[in-house]
């Protein structure tokens, strides 16, 4: 493993872990105890554009279905797990260029390491992937489908100190604002918006400042909130349907393959899924062409279907009227709230209802992750 960063390091992120992400981490034998500020959450409050709140509870006593873990700590813990497993991890070494990438081998030039030869390269190097750029395969002017702002807040004395909030305000749709609880009365607070002609950076900066004056948000956060450090902003790529997935002996994963959920901007589970899919493709095939085909087919049968569903739902949620109606239906019965919140947190694949091959008897009734810890 080679990374230009030296861990621990901050990472612009909402820090939310869905059920899918939690199950994958458990499958990788990752321990939540290695993340000091890990916080499981049970209550989810979603506010409609008309101001009405939908309160939903994730199952208790059945494992973890949602958690918040600061990426500075989570990523460092994953790096330490790799080191403990005997995996060489080279920190603080930047990628320079691809020297060779053909049917026989792939070699890359790494700062401080020199020329490195490998059977395959899995490029988890972000939306602006330097590896993809080195191969002249980047899209000029591409800025992502979403843009997000985030800041940590302390001294939160409102209900947001314990409960997870999502606000679908009219001017954010199909985006939203969020408050994800952390230990010691801290939260990860932010918002995300889809990029279009009306959402310039100046508009988003103005919106960011305005959020702190909105009464419903102030009511959730309380009246003693203290912003920590500065806010950070980042682009979110969500176009796995037409992103470059692989070339030669190089496979792109995570943000480098634009794998985030286009409806929510969530990407931790997708990064883990694509990384595992790339590793499986390499392990179970003999030739580069077979590896690329296997990897691409895996993405087509899993993430691509979910991407199309999220894209469709995102268009629906662009309308305040439609969003109000959807949330009114969700709030109509205990049954709809119970199953909607599990679907919302990726207890099942986003498009599972329309992909029968992924149906199973325990649909939306499976236990969460880490049952012995919850």
Annotated model-derived regions:
Residues 22-76:
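A conserved beta-strand/loop capping segment in the N-terminal third of enzymes
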Residues 49-52, 99-106, 246-248:
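A short, glycine/Asx- and small/polar-enriched loop/turn
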Residues 1-2, 123, 253:
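Generic enzyme active-site microenvironment
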Residues 81-221, 242:
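Predominantly flavin-linked oxidoreductase catalytic cores and closely associated redox partners
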Residues 280-374:
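C-terminal helical "tail/cap" subdomain of flavin- and related membrane-associated enzymes
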């Amino acid at each position: 493993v080679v990374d230009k960063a030296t861990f621990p390091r901050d990472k612009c992120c909402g820090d939310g872990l869905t059920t899918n992400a939690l199950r994958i981490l458990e499958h990788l034998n990752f321990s939540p105890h290695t993340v000091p500020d890990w916080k499981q959450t049970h209550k989810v409050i979603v506010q409609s554009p008309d101001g009405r709140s939908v309160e939903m509870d994730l199952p208790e006593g059945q494992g973890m279905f949602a958690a918040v873990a600061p990426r500075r700590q989570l990523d460092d813990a994953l790096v330490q797990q790799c080191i403990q497993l005997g995996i060489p991890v080279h920190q603080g070494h930047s990628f320079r260029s691809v020297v060779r990438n053909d049917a026989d081998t792939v070699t890359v030039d790494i700062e401080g390491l020199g020329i490195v030869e490998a059977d395959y390269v899995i490029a988890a190097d972000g939306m602006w992937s330097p590896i993809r750029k080195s191969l002249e395969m980047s899209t000029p002017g591409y800025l992502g489908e979403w843009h997000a702002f985030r800041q940590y807040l302390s001294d939160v004395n409102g209900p947001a100190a314990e409960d997870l909030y999502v606000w679908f305000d009219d001017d954010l749709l199909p985006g939203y604002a969020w408050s994800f609880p952390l230990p010691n009365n801290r939260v990860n607070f932010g918002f995300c918006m889809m990029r279009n002609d009306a959402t310039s950076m100046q508009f988003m900066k103005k919106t960011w400042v305005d959020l702190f004056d909105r009464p419903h948000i102030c009511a959730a956060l309380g009246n003693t909130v203290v912003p920590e450090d500065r806010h950070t902003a980042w682009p979110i790529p969500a176009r796995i349907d037409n992103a470059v997935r692989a070339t030669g002996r190089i496979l792109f994963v995570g943000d480098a393959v634009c794998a985030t959920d286009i409806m929510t901007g969530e990407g931790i589970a997708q990064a883990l899924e694509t990384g595992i899919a790339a590793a499986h493709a390499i392990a179970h095939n003999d030739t580069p062409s077979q590896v690329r085909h296997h990897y691409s087919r895996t993405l087509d049968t899993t993430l691509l279907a979910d991407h199309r569903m999220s894209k469709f739902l995102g268009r629906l949620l662009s309308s305040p009227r439609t969003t109000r109606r959807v949330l009114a239906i969700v709030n109509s019965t205990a049954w709809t709230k119970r199953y909607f919140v599990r679907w919302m947190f990726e207890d099942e694949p986003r498009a599972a209802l329309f992909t029968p091959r992924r149906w199973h008897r325990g649909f939306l009734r499976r236990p969460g992750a880490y049952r012995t810890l919850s």
